[in-house]
Amino acid sequence: MDKFTTLEGVAAPLKIINVDTDMIIPKQYLKTIKRTGLGKGLFSEQRYQDDGSENPDFILNKPAYRSAKILVAGDNFGCGSSREHAPWALLDFGIRCVISTSFGDIFYNNCFKNGVLPIRVSQDDLDKLFDDAERGSNATVTIDLPAQEIRGPDGGTVKFEIDPFRKHCLINGLDDIGLTLEKKASIDSYEDKLKTERAWA
């Protein structure tokens, strides 16, 4: 998992509440267990029209937001069924941070496990970030995870809270396997101790 320290990029405003995981990545993309290639399926029912052409009105199809790294979204983002493909699709598209007032619990946890930072902010702060994001490609936003703050294009800041353990994992790029490897020396030492104490076993 790639480390997450500071992220600077365009923020795309998605002013829709209750975006569920089926909207993020529709069920037809769930057959694969590969994490790559899912970016094409991200919001596919909104990004594409029935004939397969792009919907020019959808935010991520607009020129200013095609390379967005940050998504500013309405309340209750990622609700619905458990679908780890949802953060995979965001990440494969290039989005590493989602900002909202609240998230679906399972989606929220899956984001951390896959290197995507979900940030909860107040409604007032979200409205300010929507205003920043609507400035298009001029709306460069910086996410500073060590400092736990969001910096807008005009220098304004929004502080955010994050669990210290999850912060540690993101900054160091540690997924479940990485966490185990981080403790490898302690695990090896414990196993050696057991072998000595229970040589009969």
From Swiss-Prot:
Function noted in UniProt: Catalyzes the isomerization between 2-isopropylmalate and 3-isopropylmalate, via the formation of 2-isopropylmaleate.
Quaternary structure and interacting proteins, as annotated: Heterodimer of LeuC and LeuD.
GO molecular function: 3-isopropylmalate dehydratase activity
Gene3D superfamilies reported for this sequence: Aconitase, domain 4
Catalytic activity: (2R,3S)-3-isopropylmalate = (2S)-2-isopropylmalate
Protein name per Swiss-Prot or TrEMBL: 3-isopropylmalate dehydratase small subunit
Pathway(s) served: Amino-acid biosynthesis; L-leucine biosynthesis; L-leucine from 3-methyl-2-oxobutanoate: step 2/4
GO biological process: L-leucine biosynthetic process
Alphabetic keyword roster: Amino-acid biosynthesis, Branched-chain amino acid biosynthesis, Leucine biosynthesis, Lyase
Family membership noted in the UniProt record: Belongs to the LeuD family. LeuD type 1 subfamily.
GO cellular component: 3-isopropylmalate dehydratase complex
Keyword Aminoacyl-tRNA synthetase on entry: no
Annotated EC: 4.2.1.33
Keyword Amino-acid biosynthesis: yes
